[in-house]
Amino acid sequence: MALTTKPHHLQRSFLSPSRVSGERYLESAPSCLRFRRSGVQCSVVAKECRVKGVKARQIIDSRGNPTVEVDLITDDLYRSAVPSGASTGIYEALELRDGDKSVYGGKGVLQAIKNINELVAPKLIGVDVRNQADVDALMLELDGTPNKSKLGANAILGVSLSVCRAGAGAKGVPLYKHIQETSGTKELVMPVPAFNVINGGSHAGNSLAMQEFMILPVGATSFSEAFQMGSEVYHTLKGIIKTKYGQDACNVGDEGGFAPNVQDNREGLVLLIDAIEKAGYTGKIKIGMDVAASEFFMKDGRYDLNFKKQPNDGAHVLSAESLADLYREFIKDFPIVSIEDPFDQDDWSSWASLQSSVDIQLVGDDLLVTNPKRIAEAIKKQSCNALLLKVNQIGTVTESIQAALDSKAAGWGVMVSHRSGETEDNFIADLSVGLASGQIKTGAPCRSERLSKYNQLLRIEEELGNVRYAGEAFRSP
């Protein structure tokens, strides 16, 4: 059978996420769409910059819960999906759920979908997608609440992400380049991946109180080498865990890390050291932790490291001062370079005390919730020295970029992050490169919703060629 030549627009090579002909989509709205990828090349004829349509739907995330997906149509279709967290900060923008316990246990997002299709979509028709800040401001005005509770942050974010992709497509540049230009970032930098290889806390069914035990290949010379190092340590760790705890202990948590049934957090760190050494990367791979301490903070100001077992005898309850001493012991005994959320989101004094006594990176997640106001307060109180950037905590691309810029201006590090409930959407990979954040965490080198981000970073590095890897300078790339 003779081969026919594909139309020129289907031959082009694109890196960033999916799009199809917008006109064809509007005419027939087929259930199965042929995609081409937005970003790397652009035709001689300028692409249409105006919104012609917006369509939202309910899809399912990696934990089996509903989430929002948004198609935005110009000449092409740009699709984005919204993540969701398990351990969420009380100051995050509101994730709108339906609350009907008879449908998806109350976790449906049909109201958020309705808000997009009936309230947001009509307002965006004819809007120029290259003006990200203007589009986001329009949605914030339409919502009119401090925490995006009218439309839902998950509704607003889905549209905002698709607008950003459409802006890149309209300009004929990769998504990461569009983000670089939008944010005013001088140099593109490949981030150090923080692989979450042991899961605890709210992400796993074991007894570990602390949520994430991560490895950071700071000694690599490229992202691809860093990924190889992380993958090899991950598989080495699996062998160690299988030998020590049995096959069942090799089951993975929400983010692809192993969840061995150990309670002693120090034991988790020893497992990492053993795997790093056995894989041959001692000195080249450092350790990071996400404690997620708000999950086990008690009303009396203490912290229960056995919070998963209720009731318990209180033997593992520590004061904030004792918990800080435990962190300092960990830092002394292990090559730890980063600790996230070591204390509760409102325990400002404990944050500041630890910050003044250690020289590692202290990352604010629940403390900051990617909110410029919380960031400003933390800068004033000298509570931490790095931002965990989660786009769904704040709800728009514009505010996410501003949070990163404010943090960098204060001399902080910026770690772009996924959520435990993820999709195949890989926006944050381009975001990390475009902002030159220097570091990203998006789970273990396992589970497709995690690898979609890492694989996108491999593609970006391949396309950019001689691009700098943040390495040891991940805090200030």
UniProtKB/Swiss-Prot annotation:
pH dependence: Optimum pH is 7.5-8.5 for the forward reaction (PEP formation) and 6.0-7.5 for the reverse reaction (2-PGA formation).
Tissue: Highly expressed in young roots, young siliques, and shoot apex. Lowly expressed in young leaves, stems and cotyledons.
Active site: E255 (proton donor), K390 (proton acceptor)
Disruption phenotype: Distorted trichomes and reduced numbers of root hairs.
UniProt binding sites for substrate: H203, E212, E340, D365, S417, H418, R419, S420, K441
Sequence positions that bind Mg(2+): D290, E340, D365
Catalytic activities: (2R)-2-phosphoglycerate = phosphoenolpyruvate + H2O
Record-level Gene Ontology MF annotations: magnesium ion binding; phosphopyruvate hydratase activity
EC number: 4.2.1.11
Cofactor note: Mg(2+) is required for catalysis and for stabilizing the dimer.
Keyword Transmembrane: no
InterPro entries: Enolase, Enolase-like_C_sf, Enolase-like_N, Enolase_C, Enolase_CS, Enolase_N
Keyword field: Chloroplast, Glycolysis, Lyase, Magnesium, Metal-binding, Phosphoprotein, Plastid, Transit peptide
Subcellular location: Plastid, Chloroplast
Presequence boundaries: 1-41
Necessary cofactors: Mg(2+)
Gene3D superfamilies: Enolase-like C-terminal domain, Enolase-like, N-terminal domain
GO cellular component: chloroplast; chloroplast stroma; phosphopyruvate hydratase complex
Top-level taxon in the UniProt lineage: Eukaryota
Pathway: Carbohydrate degradation; glycolysis; pyruvate from D-glyceraldehyde 3-phosphate: step 4/5
Recorded family membership: Belongs to the enolase family.
Name of the protein in its database record: Enolase 1, chloroplastic
Source species of the chain: Arabidopsis thaliana (Mouse-ear cress)
Gene that encodes it: ENO1
